[in-house]
Amino acid sequence: PIKLYRKACFDEIGGLQACLGWDSIDQWLVQFWGWQVKTFTSLKVKHLKATGQDYRPGQLSNQGRAFAHMGYGFWLSLLSLVKLGIYHKNPKLVHNGLIQYWRHRNALMVSKEQAKFIRKSLWYSILNNR
């Protein structure tokens, strides 16, 4: 997939964040400001570099930092890291991810109000199986 934004939407979300997790932050902010996220499966895009190509196994623990940037809070970060650890069959990912989360827990890349919106949306999705 490729991300496209209306100019007004892009301006309202403040552009793209220069941080780990930017590709999730923009989607949360789009929803926070009341814009819609749409996927056009008929649009054909050729990526010259595969998504995630530069990831190395150790970088997955940086997800804890990304969760801190997005304001997930401890419990959502823990749940997300456990899910990643199970998916990648790597229990160390949970431990290392929590260390990264703890180190960066005060480095929000969104406002407190936006972080609250993100947490509320995530809990709703989890509790309603969406």
Where are these regions (language model features)?
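Conserved nucleotide-sugar donor-binding
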Residues: 1-14
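Residues that recognize and position ribonucleotide moieties
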Residues: 3, 38, 68
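A short, conserved alpha-helix in the catalytic core of glycosyltransferases
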Residues: 9-12, 19-49
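General secondary-structure edge motif
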Residues: 10, 58-59
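Short, surface-exposed loop/turn motifs that are enriched in glycine and acidic residues
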Residues: 15-20, 64-68
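Alpha-helix boundary/capping detector
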Residues: 36-37, 56, 104
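Outer-membrane beta-barrel translocator/channel fold
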Residues: 51-55
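Non-catalytic, C-terminal membrane-associated alpha-helical segments of glycosyltransferases
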Residues: 59-130
